[in-house]
Amino acid sequence: MKNNFLKILYTTPILHYPPESGPSLRVENSIKALSKISNLYLYSRSSIYNIGGKRALDFYKIYYKNVYFSPLSSFYLPNVFNVFTEKIFRKKILPVRTESEEIYRDILRIADKTRANIIWLGYGNLSYPLLKYLKQNSSYKVVLDTDSVWSRFVLRGLPFAQKEKEKTKIIKAGKAKEAEEIWGAKLADVTTAVSEVDASYYRQFVRKKDQVKIFSNVIDLETYQLGSKKENNRYPSLLLSGTFWPGSPMEDAARWFIDKVWPEIKHKIPKIKLYIIGKGSDKVLNLVDEKQIIIKGQVESVLPYFFNASLMVVPLRFESGTRFKILEAGACGIPVVSTTLGAEGLKLKNNIEIEIADTVRQFASSVISLLLSKEKSQTIATNLKKIVRQNYDLRTLEHQGYEIIKSLL
């Protein structure tokens, strides 16, 4: 499938090894898939230090022909992300820096130097200004690679805002992002979406429907073969995983689960444990004080937690995109209980490959039922693993990438 004459310049504001979050995992898997079908050149808008140093370079070098760093990469991390998180959640998630035309000009210089056929904007949700610059100043084909509908992510937090001032900020930020998504979809040669749910949104704004293509969230199944031996756990355990910051979807999900659902589960299964992992979880939930809730924060590897959990819970009430954690749970052979929104965009059948529950009683009942029935739990887990292997591994992404490239050449 690889086209040795095709050159892609892949540029991203978010790159890290090992992956710290869903976005960085998506970038990693995109690089792996695109390297299988093209000669890939990597342009990082973050410094060597910020992507993980020599360890990261050693990991990525097998996938790219060459790597370039922007002249300002030592000082830059995405500012746009902070604009939204500070307005909505009252917290800057990343150090504030701004991209400049100097970086954009350098990207074009490298595109010319490598004779790239396509410029691929990884984590395109942060790359709209770059998209505009490239289309105004060059004739390159540009792929805007999104991982969600960010305006939905913002606006879905509206029902959970406590104050009118906060609601006003959410509406303003959401509408601003919506406007960006509209002109961005029209301007990009291709806008990618992680699911048909997101794709149907972007297709509203384009003249030709093939300007929007699916480029799914997937996982590299080989990664999940490591350390697969399960420990002998005396008591059942639940796993809650994600990226946390004050007011984040994960904070809301964790607090709803801990305050409302957890007591009902403990009543039926008194010795159960809940493990919470992910960047910021230890800080955001630092006041949670219960021996059976173990909050680990950011961990070096999620694999021991996934492989040894009895069950994964995804109690999200607002978000956008598709959840890597569900795919990871499937790869590791554990069942999942999720809200409808948490499983959005994934082609999974309720009560067959996943358990869907949206109320406190439903969620607690689904968790208890799976924990008390090994046969049911194993069936759900096996079916989920089968779907992940069929539809959500790197081969799927390679095929989708090939179709995107074919439409542009």
Regions found by a protein language model. Give the residues of each.
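Conserved acidic donor-binding segment of nucleotide-sugar-dependent glycosyltransferases
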Residues: 354-361, 369-375
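Short hydrophobic beta-strand element within catalytic cores of glycosyltransferases
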Residues: 325-328, 335-339
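Conserved catalytic-core segment of nucleotide-activated headgroup transferases in glycan assembly
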Residues: 26, 214-289, 295-300, 307
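A charged, aromatic-enriched C-terminal amphipathic alpha-helix characteristic of glycosyltransferases
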Residues: 375-406
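N-terminal subdomain of nucleotide-sugar transferases
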Residues: 1-68, 114, 264-267
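Acidic donor-binding loop of glycosyltransferase active sites
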Residues: 189, 307-321, 332-334
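Acceptor-binding helix/loop patch of EC 2.4 sugar-transfer enzymes
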Residues: 74-96, 142-182
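Donor nucleotide-sugar binding/catalytic pocket of nucleotide-sugar-dependent glycosyltransferases
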Residues: 141, 151, 174, 182, ...
